[in-house]
């Protein structure tokens, strides 16, 4: 599926149907050094989160995805290490690969409590190792949600700490053949890291090729004035995209004129 075909279908509300809020847009799944040089064309690879496609079983959902040209699968990270064999078997012989892994860790990296940070590090590394076994492009993480307290203050020192810890995680992810993917959220969900540009600058400062970032049209609607500017600012660190309708966070195209993604896709192209 190419960019023009996807945009035409979603903008008239006739995109690939789904039973859950999100479908996803993913960059090429094998590891690379970024989206390529400006002016180069990049393939559009659609990916669904695990429960997006209709079906009672995983096999039925994967059948649906294949029938509609969806070539990526984004499972959750919780208990992922115990599911590696199951997922490999389910994907065997299919034109579907694991794209990103959606979080699933315990604790959080910016907790003021050492034991909570240690729990995050332990469980995140378990997920990263499983992601590598599955050939995933990376594990999505958020530094802290609004409900997670006590949390480190929003200071330059906290940013320095985050950069240092992500460098270690990123280097470990590279050893496992995958990456860590930072996801900016809107201010109603997270006080820290709300724009793609900020995520990209953190990726840069880690100095690790195992730390990348992503954009999400839903969060960008609240936090950025330009989709083009937001995604272009991600540069070579941008690895994955989430897309949803911009008014109700459902299927792209369901909210009429609000669901205009053209500027964002221009940046991705």
Question: What are these model-predicted stretches?
Answer:
Residues 2-50, 54-69, 135-137, 193-215, ...:
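Histidine-acidic metal/acid-base catalytic patches
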Residues 8-22, 35-38, 110, 114-212, ...:
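Active-site acidic/histidine proton-transfer and metal-coordination neighborhood
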Residues 52-54, 79, 104-107, 145-147, ...:
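Active-site-proximal loop/turn and secondary-structure-junction residues that shape catalytic pockets
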Residues 82-95, 123-135, 163-171, 226-233, ...:
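Short amphipathic alpha-helices and their capping/turn segments at secondary-structure boundaries
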Residues 91-115:
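Mid-chain, structured segments of secreted extracytoplasmic proteins
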